[in-house]
Curated annotation (Swiss-Prot):
Residues 8-21 have a biased composition (Basic and acidic residues). The gene is NP. Late in virus-infected cells, may be cleaved from a 56-kDa protein to a 53-kDa protein by a cellular caspase. This cleavage might be a marker for the onset of apoptosis in infected cells or have a specific function in virus host interaction. GO terms for molecular function: RNA binding; structural molecule activity. Pfam families: Flu_NP. GO terms for biological process: symbiont entry into host cell; viral penetration into host nucleus. A motif (Bipartite nuclear localization signal) lies at residues 198-216. It is found in: Virion; Host nucleus. This is Nucleoprotein.
Length: 498
């Protein structure tokens, strides 16, 4: 891992913090959670939601999206300047679901953005509380990562759909700040850079003039973020090359795709945090729990304990399986879309299945879906054990992997070997080592060739009983190696569309 000295912890990123000690970090993260909870309670009052309706995850998503939209300044400016028919740039809203005469009804609500901003600031002691907004963005991003496989997006940028384990955070908005950058996967950063370079190739003025200077510094900043995720000198040197290019073009795209492929074996460090829906924080605050006073961490036992004692409901379509819907949301809550399923099954205490085997669509309900046949059920979000989230890619080793996803991105710091399909990955690296990055390419390929099957990652790290808050007795899990490790295995997940 790169020198921890120069890096800020996630909690510091999450709270724009100067250097803080653990207690201060726990308090400031707790303060952020309190703010989200208070906002949610107030919105439920405004919308006259019953306790049950307030714990409905679909209502939570609508309320979260309303506040994110109210604070999306760039989009708000754009809407003011490009008025479109039937869209009031000053208003925000969405579907709210209520139980009327034993049936679920959809009601479309509309609020002034100004009013939503006022309620949010009031819940956050007058601050804009950007950290809380980012937290909700990351929860939405984690839910997308668990629900959709970004096949089309990968193919469009010239990458391979089997590289989906690198795509964490691919739907995060640009404005998600340092905390957002920390949770983006290598593939997500590569995709953003390739899109930028392609625009530069097609639009002569992209890098020129006053705007071009801003564009250029954004490009270099993104290169540096990606460089910071890599853990080997050769991968980093390659990023320096891409960043320093006078006129980024196809050579840089090649280098970026090469480095993304290499990350399937020489994994980058990507942060993982458990970001829960607002309807979990609201009731906890309402019950009198003081997150700021008690302290809270997104990477320890706290989210597990909170989910252990939370009641969350979801609408269920006629042919969906509530247990499968629960798995989808549970994985999203722990940022675990690309984690090894065998480890997830162990932590959760029930079998976690690949996406293609789940009888469930996304959590959100489209406006044209028929409400008459909608039922609701409790989401089972409890776990058997808890484990510390990781921001390291772990070491590498080899293992039978699947036809769909060919590598994993660990979310938990737990001893295991990380599955990846070495022969499939290495087949992509035949002979392409010419050009100015040839020495780096050769070095990267040599390291990948050397990745050994018996190597164990996170040695000595285990999972913990939920009673073991101080993480004193690690339980090192044993796995059934015959089981499938990849979530998007030979997959048929829906495609993510904005």
């Amino acid at each position: 891992m790169a020198s921890q000295g120069t890096k800020r912890s996630y909690e510091q990123m999450e709270t724009d913090g100067e250097r803080q000690n653990a207690t201060e970090i726990r308090a400031s993260v707790g303060k952020m959670i309190d703010g989200i909870g208070r906002f949610y309670i107030q919105m439920c009052t405004e919308l006259k939601l019953s306790d049950y309706e307030g714990r409905l995850i679909q209502n939570s998503l609508t309320i979260e999206r309303m506040v994110l939209s109210a604070f999306d300044e760039r989009r708000n400016r754009y809407l003011e300047e490009h008025p479109s028919a039937g869209k009031d740039p000053k208003k925000t809203g969405g579907p709210i679901y209520k139980r009327v005469d034993g049936k679920w009804m959809r009601e479309l609500v509309l609020y002034d953005k100004e009013e939503i901003r006022r309620i949010w600031r009031q819940a956050n002691n007058g601050d804009d509380a950007t950290a809380g907004l980012t937290h909700m963005m990351i929860w939405h991003s984690n839910l997308n990562d668990t629900t959709y496989q970004r096949t089309r997006a990968l193919v469009r940028t010239g990458m391979d759909p089997r590289m989906c384990s690198l795509m964490q955070g691919s739907t995060l908005p640009r404005r998600s700040g340092a905390a957002g950058a920390a949770v983006k996967g290598v593939g997500t950063m590569v995709m953003e850079l390739i899109r930028m370079i392609k625009r530069g190739i097609n639009d002569r003025n992209f890098w020129r003039g006053e705007n071009g200077r801003k564009t250029r510094s954004a490009y270099e900043r993104m290169c540096n973020i990606l460089k910071g995720k890599f853990q080997t000198a050769a991968q980093r040197a390659m990023m320096d090359q891409v960043r320093e290019s006078r006129n980024p073009g196809n050579a840089e795209i090649e280098d970026l795709i090469f480095s993304a492929r290499s990350a399937l074996i020489l994994r980058g460090s990507v942060a993982h945090k458990s970001c829960l829906p607002a309807c979990v924080y609201g009731p906890a605050v309402a019950s009198g729990y003081n997150f700021e006073k008690e302290g809270y961490s997104l990477v320890g036992i706290d989210p597990f304990k909170l989910l252990q004692n939370s009641q969350v409901y979801s609408l269920i379509r006629p042919n969906e399986n509530p247990a499968h819907k629960s798995q989808l949301v549970w994985m999203a809550c722990h940022s675990a879309a690309f984690e090894d399923l065998r480890l997830l099954s162990f932590i959760r205490g029930t079998k976690v299945s690949p996406r293609g085997k789940l009888s469930t669509r996304g959590v959100q309900i489209a406006s044209n879906e028929n409400m008459d046949t909608m039922e609701s059920s409790t989401l089972e979000l409890r776990s058997r054990y808890w484990a510390i989230r990781t921001r390291s890619g772990g070491n590498t080793n080899q293992q039978r992997a699947s036809a769909g996803q060919i590598s994993v991105q660990p979310a938990f710091s737990v001893q295991r070997n990380l599955p990846f399909d070495k022969s499939t990955i290495m087949a992509a690296f035949t002979g392409n080592t010419e050009g100015r990055t040839s020495d780096m390419r050769a070095e990267i390929i040599r390291m990948m060739e050397g990745a050994k099957p018996e190597e164990v990652s996170f040695r000595g790290r285990g999972v913990f009983e939920l009673s073991d808050e101080k993480a004193t007795n690690p339980v090192v899990p044993s796995f059934d190696m015959s089981n499938e490790g990849s979530y998007f295995f030979g997959d048929n997940a829906e495609e993510y569309d904005n």
